Design a protein with these regions (language model features):
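Short amphipathic alpha-helical segments
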Residues: 18-21, 71-74, 100-102
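Short acidic-hydrophobic, aromatic-tinged amphipathic segments that line or gate anion-handling sites
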Residues: 109-115
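Conserved N-terminal substructure of TIR/SEFIR domains
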Residues: 1-61, 65, 80-84, 94-95, ...
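Glycine-rich, Arg-bearing micro-motifs that act as flexible, cationic patches
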Residues: 68
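Glycine-rich, charge-decorated loop segments at or immediately adjacent to ligand/cofactor-binding or catalytic sites
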Residues: 94-106
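Conserved beta-strand/loop subsegment of P-loop NTPase cores
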Residues: 86-90
Length: 166
């Protein structure tokens, strides 16, 4: 099944991503994630490549787990190579690692960690609509009225090389 939006995420973030998928689908956004789009006995790498090829936008769910995920880094690289539009969605307040910095330079992100997920989802819907993804009219109208949760790309890159302190 072809979808307009591919979500790249780490398996450790699955519960938050499934909540996000449900919210996006309520706005009639066509979403593909690995757990729902891969049939049994198929080559999962081939399915992922086809899903990225067929999507309009890759949502990159950024978290400490995803920045360490080899598969997430590969999906981002493939989407970038295929010139797909990328919408970074930060699940936590963390810097962008060097492995993703090049592909995300200058791209605005949505912050999904502010305990105001409804408004963040509205910002995503607004962004997806601007990137050519079909959303239902009611969701589009609500998104247009919602406050923004978009951060400018260059501001989040300055912490890319920063080390975490405990």
């Amino acid at each position: 099944m072809s979808a307009e939006v591919f979500i790249s995420y780490a398996s450790e973030d699955r519960s938050r991503i499934l909540d996000l998928v449900e919210r996006l689908r309520k706005a009639d956004v066509s979403v593909w994630i690995d757990q729902m789009g891969i049939e049994g006995a198929t080559m999962w790498t081939q399915e992922i490549v086809e899903a990225i090829d067929n999507c309009k936008v890759l949502i990159l769910a950024i978290s400490p787990s995803s920045t360490e995920s080899e598969n997430v880094v590969k999906e981002l690289a493939l989407a970038s190579e295929r010139r797909k539009k990328i919408l970074p969605v930060c699940l936590e307040s963390s810097g962008i690692p060097k492995s993703m910095e090049y592909q995300l330079a200058g791209i605005q992100r949505v912050d999904y960690f502010l305990n105001q997920e409804d408004q963040a989802v509205q910002a995503m819907i607004r962004s997806l609509g601007k990137l050519g993804v079909a959303v239902n009219d009611e969701a589009s109208d609500q998104a247009a009225k919602a406050p923004g949760f978009i951060s400018h790309g260059s501001s989040h890159l300055k912490d890319a090389g920063a080390k975490k302190t405990k």
